[in-house]
A protein has these predicted regions:
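Short catalytic/ligand-binding loop motif for oxyanion handling, primarily in non-cytosolic enzymes
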Residues: 13-14, 60-63, 145
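Surface-exposed cleft-lining segments at the edges of enzyme active sites
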Residues: 10, 26-32, 129-131
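Short conserved beta-strand segments at catalytic cores or DNA/RNA-binding microdomains
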Residues: 13-25
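Conserved DEDDh/DEDDy metal-dependent 3′-5′ exonuclease domain
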Residues: 23-107
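Two-metal-ion RNase H-like nuclease active-site motif
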Residues: 1-11, 137
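Short amphipathic alpha-helical segments
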Residues: 17, 64-66, 149
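Acidic, Mg2+-coordinating catalytic module of metal-dependent nucleases/exonucleases
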Residues: 102-167
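Short, flexible loop segments at boundaries between secondary-structure elements
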Residues: 81-90, 165-175
Length: 177
């Protein structure tokens, strides 16, 4: 089963700034605004059977569909690992879940808000800002595989369980940090 892990970074207006994909068989690839290409993105996913995200059904994939014109959920099986986490009583954003499971991160302290700040720092020409943003996104996509392995869902396809945490309705903000 060939799988890919997808994560995006955005600015405060939810415009894509970085799109990252990790394929265990090919490594990571990232696209930075304005150099997005629907063709390149889908070409990199060619041969993939399953795409995994964290909160991707509500955040990443709708933005990719709207802004890149790539409907990932109609082209590939999608598994949102956030739902698997909920089924295992692991709640919170990706970084919080990683910490609970002992998944290491070199970009400790960088979160979604900091990613927005890094994007603006890059746009102002600050040295190193884009590099740190790309390392952060790369860790996101690579750590999704570590998360899937810890959850034991790597060989599974199709949607994750749809169990919502007790007392939580729809989350309208991004549950990633």
């Amino acid at each position: 089963l060939i799988r890919a892990y997808v994560d995006v970074e955005t600015d405060e207006m939810k415009a894509l700034t970085v799109v990252g994909v990790f394929r265990p068989d090919r490594g990571a690839k990232q696209w930075v605004r304005p150099n997005f290409s629907r063709f390149d993105f889908l070409n990199f996913l060619s041969g993939v059977e399953s795409v995994m995200t964290y909160n991707g059904a509500r955040f990443d994939l709708p933005l990719i569909k709207e802004q890149l014109g790539a409907d990932v959920e109609s082209l590939f099986r999608h598994r949102d690992l956030m739902l698997d986490c909920w089924a295992n009583n692991l709640y919170g954003g990706l970084k919080k879940v990683e910490a609970q499971l002992g998944i290491h991160r070199d970009t400790e302290g960088v979160d979604g808000l900091q990613a927005i700040r890094l994007w603006h720092a890059h746009r102002r020409g600050e040295t190193g800002a884009l590099d740190l943003l790309l390392r952060y996104n790369r860790e996101d996509v690579e750590n999704l595989e570590a998360l899937a392995l810890k959850l034991g869902v790597v060989g599974k396809v199709g949607p994750a369980p749809a169990r919502r945490p007790a007392g939580q309705g729809d989350v309208h903000e991004r549950a990633r940090t």
